[in-house]
Each structure stands twice: as C-alpha cells, then as structure tokens.
C-alpha cells in the first residue's frame, strides 16, 4: 500500500478545509501586520496540504530527529505558509499568538523563515534560489549518510516549494544541473507555477520551458493541476519512485480563493484588505473569526504529527538495535576526535624544525592531509579548481552518481551552487564541508556565503590566489576589495595565514567552530616559515600577536597579514640594522578573533607607537587597527598582468617602501627635529617619497 492510500478515499474532501485553514491564517496574519505576502500561501495551500497530509514524515515533538523528511520553503516570502503549517501540526513554539505577531520584533514569525529562530525551520530563505540550492546539499548529505549507515538509519526525502523567482535566479541553474548529474533521487521540488511576478505576468520577462530545462538537466518532470489533490498526490508518488530528482510543476492561481483578487499580482506582496478578506470568507464558506481554526480541522492536521511520531519511534528501535549506533550519533553530532588537535600540534612542531617554505594553499593541503586522516567528518570539494586550490587529499575519494561513499565533490564551475550546497550539507548534519575556489570568485558565491554566516554554519571556504601574488592572470583574477567585503560580514572568520604554522593553527580553529563559518585566504606564491619559536600554543586563536618584538621600546609597529608578513619582517630588520629604529611586527591572521580579545590584549599587541599596515589589498577596514599616527602600504586600485615580483615592486608593496613610510611617519611625528631611534639617539635619514610611492 502506498503512503497516500493510507489516508483513505475521502481524503480530498477534508483536505479542502485543511488547505483553507492555511489560506485564512495567512490572510489574517498579513492583514494584521499590514505587511507580507498572502498570494503564494493561498496558491500553494492545496498542494502543500497533500504533501503534509499524505507523505511527509516529521515529528514536531522531536524537530531535530535526524531521519525526518526535510521541507524547504525556497520561496521564503511565503513564510506564512510555513508558520501556518507549524501551528497546525503542533510545533510547541508556534501558538496562535505567534501567528498574530507576524513580522513583529521579537516574534518567532519573522518576515522570511530564519534557521534557528523557530523550531522546524530547516534553512533560512528569502533570497530567491537559495532554498532550492541549499536543498541540493541536504539531498547530497542524505545520500552520503545512507551510503555510510544504510537505509535503515537514513532514508528520507528533501521536499522543496519553489516559485518562479527561484527558478529565474542564476544559482538555480547551478543547483539543478548538479542535482541532475548526481541523480539525487530523494529530492522533490514542487514548483508554484502561478506565472505571476511582482511586475505582472511572468511572460513580461521569460519564455523558458521549465519542464524541458529540468529534463535536460537529468530530472524527472511532471505538470499537474496544483489545486487537484489527487493529481498532486499521484505526482508525488511517482517522484518518490523515480531514480532521478523530481520537479512537479503545480499549476496554481496566486491568491487562490480570494473573492476578486485571485490570480492577480496584487496579492503577491500586500495585505488583501478587510473587505476582500470578508468577501473571501463568504466565498469559501469560512465563517470563523480571524486566527481561529475549528477543532476538527486542527485535529486532522495533528494526524501529520502522529504519523511522524510513529515513524520516529520505529526508527529509534532500529537505531538502538544497530551496531553502528555510537558511530552514527557521533557523526550526526559532528563530534571531533580530540586527536585532531594533537596531530596538528605535532605537524606544526615537525615543520617548525624543517622551516618549511610553501605557499599557504599548499600548507593548507598538508594540514588537511592530517585532518582528513584523523576524522571522516570532513567533505571536501572545489569549483573546478582542485589542482589550484589543493583541496583534495589522499583520503577524499570523489563522490559520483550512484556512489556517495566518497568525501570529495567536484562541484564544477558553480561557485554559488557550491556554497549553497555546502550550507545544505552542514544543515543536514553529519559532515563538515569545505570547498575551494579563487578568492576573487567569492563574488559569485556571496549570497550563499552570507547565509552561512547568518545561519551560523560550520562551513569552510578555501579561497586561494588571494592577491596580486597570483601574477600573470591579471586584474580580473586579482582580489583587491574582497577581504574587506568578507571581513565586513558578521559572524564570519576570515583567516589569512602568513606561513605553514599559522595555516595549521587556523585550520585547527576552523574545524572546531560550531556556529561560525570560516574563510581561508591563501597565497599562490611560496612563503617562508616565520614562526620559529617553540611551543604548542595556538597564537592564531588570538587573532593577532607580536611575531617579532622590537629591541627595546617600540618606535613603530608594523601590522600585516598573509604574504605581507614576510615583507613586514624584512622591513623591521632593515629599520633596526640600518636606522636603529625599534620596529615590532604584528601578524594578524584573523581580525575577528583579535576583535574578540579584551582591550588590555589589544594595547599589548598594538602598542602606542605609530603604526603601518601592510596588505596586498584595499585599505578599507584597516583604520580601526592603525590608529591616528599611521600609514597603509597596499593596493589603491586594481592590479595588472605581470609576474608577481614585478607587481609587488610596481605597486610599492615592498620592504623598501615600508621602510620609507616608517621614516616619513617618524619624521612627521617630530617635525622640528630629526626623528631618532628610541634607544640609540641615532638621527633618522630624511626621506622624500616619489609621487608614485605616495
């Protein structure tokens, strides 16, 4: 017997009233808030009622049950559809009072669904296309968990409701293509095919045959009347049987049921108004006051929770009987073995002894070789730059269609899709995803990276070729503004390590984060090992530290990150040797970690001498660390095509230029007398900077 038959032959009649409950709760909430989107919940109420009433397995009393079906509202503007469902099936944190507080400060019912803000919200949606793309990652994770633990412990579907806007966004193409290639058979997308956009009919801007598009990408695709419950049920049954991901085009009318506005784009993003809602109540035979659901309809909806609870209890019996129970639970919880930190400490000690000189992208791969050998939680990948990002290790065999036992995803040239899929993998649980591309192409992934931070997901972005140091590929590939953009993002750790020691330290931090994503900005060019002091303390965890202390009281402090720390050290040594100026060097591998330290530590590291910041990127953001008497050595515009060494000299990011800036800073600090070294009394030479250097 299939799932839908279990509901009985009279299901369709009761489902009409169940769907109307969604419609009126959505209308009432938007009306009270005078803000929101009633049209989509009203239009998709019939199809979603069938999905929940006949198929989906979730248990509101255990919203994090690992083998639950996932429901993703990609068209997040229709959030009242989700909140209404959660109230009706009995989520504890979604009483009627929350629905009547829709879009108000402090309520659980935010304008768009927010992960972690209310129970049962699988992912934050709102930026169109993100939900369907994140769902691809969830479906990948489900297949990977099933490959490791079997269908007895992992056997669930990922259902998505997507709108026209989701399918128009470019990220959807990346996600659809990847899902079809991987044959993600547990992914089912219900498309709200209402042919309405904010501006009016969708034929204003598109003539796309979406069914043909999905079929070309390897999906099963069907078209049904979205207001015919039995037709929707048959389509879902077929989708659950196919060996491909599935699209069900639900032909709907936006604002379905509205007395005079049904089918109008005016129902998309505004309250219907008291008169229209009153007329709709009369039209649909719903005589109840706002925010009221008759007990018999609420009871019908609560059967969804009963079915989910029964499924969960059966699953728990299987888990208890499984010999893999402990390993399964540790995997779901992403519990890292404490050995990882010890192994990385030994790794740092070994390379400190050897004074290993490598590009930080290579240092990252070497650290990953240690990490991936110590834990099976990590899932790597790259957007077609594996050989450049160096994200593949000996333990991470590729995942391919039909084979999900591997630990490495070839995402193709789909940076945005990769980032969203990693969000989905992290949200699903069981894995720590990392993926690589060039730093400059973080622009392409920006929307999903922002959601990583907003949701607090342990996703790791390995972004290599982080400056003009990549050389001949030129300004299209040389990031300038990207570090500033990433550092401006709340709850995102941006690591730019200076050598192999810092790289390993930063990986130790990133792999242990629970609620913060990480970015690694890594060099193409080889960098010397600068940290030669013994000790296992992870100094990068402090965000910044004094790498080279001044000899005596500081005359000047040089601040730098990544590949420019080498330049700062060379400049400090020259200032000491040639000018007897006491210069300290501060390495700042992670601003966010440094900002989290107390004021006393800030003063200890930064000191009170004039400061020079050195970074082969734009200045934006550096002033918070530089202080009033300061200078910046870095980029003021785009790069150029040339060998890396030539570019550093051309743009003045050299030890010579840093020395000149230091002397000029000290001269300006004492305009009436030549500046002198703090301890020696030796006059500092007068420097006149060329216009190019200035």
Curated annotation (Swiss-Prot):
Key word Ribonucleoprotein present: no
UniProt binding sites for thiamine diphosphate: 77, 126-128, 165, 194, 268, 441
Active site (UniProt): 415
A Pfam family assignment: Transket_pyr
UniProt xrefs under PROSITE patterns: TRANSKETOLASE_1 (PS00801), TRANSKETOLASE_2 (PS00802)
Keyword entries, A-Z: Calcium, Calvin cycle, Magnesium, Metal-binding, Plasmid, Thiamine pyrophosphate, Transferase
Catalytic activity: D-sedoheptulose 7-phosphate + D-glyceraldehyde 3-phosphate = aldehydo-D-ribose 5-phosphate + D-xylulose 5-phosphate
Documented EC number(s): 2.2.1.1
Cofactor(s) named in the record: Mg(2+); Ca(2+); Mn(2+); Co(2+)
Enzyme category, top tier: transferase
Site-annotated residues for Important for catalytic activity: 37, 268
Molecular function as annotated in GO: metal ion binding; transketolase activity
GO biological process terms on file: pentose-phosphate shunt; reductive pentose-phosphate cycle
Keyword Calcium applies: yes
Binding site residues for substrate: 37, 268, 361, 388, 465, 473, 524
Cofactor note: Binds 1 Mg(2+) ion per subunit. Can also utilize other divalent metal cations, such as Ca(2+), Mn(2+) and Co(2+).
Subunit structure: Homodimer.
NCBIfam families: tktlase_bact
Function of the protein: Catalyzes the transfer of a two-carbon ketol group from a ketose donor to an aldose acceptor, via a covalent intermediate with the cofactor thiamine pyrophosphate.
Similarity remark: Belongs to the transketolase family.
Record's protein name: Transketolase
Organism: Rhizobium meliloti (strain 1021)
